[in-house]
């Protein structure tokens, strides 16, 4: 399970000058509270990264990092006047710092991090909500803990699932037949 946050801006507020409605005149007032903006769940943005990765590569490990498939581009920016100055509403509900993104990732959250000075954001990690197990303080325990932690990250999980799917397809034709281990190894290699 992947839990994403924060919400992101789906569109600029409607106004006759900046973002007009085609069929009637409407001025959407967002000056009172930021809840009046149209926010979207970042799970949908994450789903676009998954589908784009699958469309390009036929599997889903390329979903994190701004240059490796994790970027959500062309998000709307709302420019407005406040106290005589032009301000810009960032496209994510809150600005998640690099440090906070790391802390959230360690707790199992997938955060959409706005890239400063741009109209895009990116997913920099994709940990699952599964808490890593503790295997002790020995060297073997630390290695096992790291291995378990890596196996709970979604990009690695998607690779393993795709390989398992591929092996299942290969072996589907062999259902009901009896083969030795060496014969199966030869077919898979």
Put a short name on every predicted segment.
Residues 1-20:
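Small-residue-rich
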Residues 15, 19-184:
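Long, contiguous, structured domain-core segments that constitute the functional module of a protein
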């Amino acid at each position: 399970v992947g839990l994403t946050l924060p919400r992101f801006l789906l569109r600029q507020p409607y106004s006759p000058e900046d973002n007009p409605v085609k069929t009637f005149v409407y001025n959407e007032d967002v000056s009172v509270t930021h809840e009046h903006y149209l926010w979207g769940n970042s799970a949908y943005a994450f789903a676009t990264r998954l589908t784009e990765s699958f469309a390009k590569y036929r599997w889903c490990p390329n979903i994190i990092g701004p240059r490796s498939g994790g970027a959500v581009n062309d998000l709307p920016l709302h420019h407005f006047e406040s106290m005589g100055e032009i301000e810009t509403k960032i496209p994510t509900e809150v600005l998640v710092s690099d440090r906070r993104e790391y802390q959230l990732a360690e707790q199992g959250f997938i955060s959409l991090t706005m890239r400063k000075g741009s109209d895009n954001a990116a997913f920099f990690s994709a940990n699952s909500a599964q808490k890593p197990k503790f295997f002790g303080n020995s060297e073997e325990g630390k290695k096992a803990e790291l291995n378990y932690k890596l196996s709970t990250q979604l990009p690695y999980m998607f690779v393993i699932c795709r390989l398992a799917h591929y092996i299942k397809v290969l072996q589907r034709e062999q259902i009901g037949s009896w083969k030795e281990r060496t014969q199966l190894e030869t077919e898979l290699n």
